[in-house]
């Protein structure tokens, strides 16, 4: 069966974002390569060679990948989707939601809904939209 993994684009903040996600999600950053370190170094303007060409964060066997934009076109940000993380406990979901929200914008606080033990939405400080969910069938801790 095929797996769907996300690939994000940033405007010069990829390294900081991926290190942040590594800490928040307790993953393992497997690759963080700049354009300057790659065979494509001469294809990129010198001032953009320190940008990230490819980053890969392992999240328990799944991948969150990213790079920095190097196009001369204006960067329009991350739009039109949200990344969804599903947890088995409300406590873990709350920890992640709180850490992701630091410096970001909460769109919907993490709370019980008619479809979930907990659900919340936010945009983190790097502009990435997130949905944090705990399925109703998961045993909410403390209840």
Please give the residue ranges for each predicted region.
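Core segments of cupin and vicinal oxygen chelate
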Residues: 8-61
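Vicinal oxygen chelate
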Residues: 2, 30-33, 58, 65-76, ...
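Short, solvent-exposed loop/turn segments at the edges of secondary structure
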Residues: 52, 78-80
């Amino acid at each position: 069966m095929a797996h769907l993994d996300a690939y994000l684009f940033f405007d010069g903040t990829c390294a900081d974002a991926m290190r942040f996600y590594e800490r928040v999600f307790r993953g393992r950053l497997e690759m963080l390569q700049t354009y300057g370190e790659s065979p494509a170094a001469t294809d990129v303007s010198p001032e953009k060679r320190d940008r990230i060409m490819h980053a890969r964060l392992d999240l328990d066997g799944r991948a969150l990948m990213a790079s920095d934009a190097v196009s001369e076109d204006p960067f329009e940000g991350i739009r039109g989707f949200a990344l969804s993380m599903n947890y088995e406990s409300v406590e873990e979901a709350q920890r992640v939601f709180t850490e992701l929200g630091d410096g970001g914008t909460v769109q919907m606080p993490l709370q019980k809904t008619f479809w979930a033990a907990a659900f919340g939405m936010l945009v983190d400080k790097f502009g990435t939209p997130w949905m944090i969910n705990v399925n109703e069938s998961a045993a909410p801790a403390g209840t």
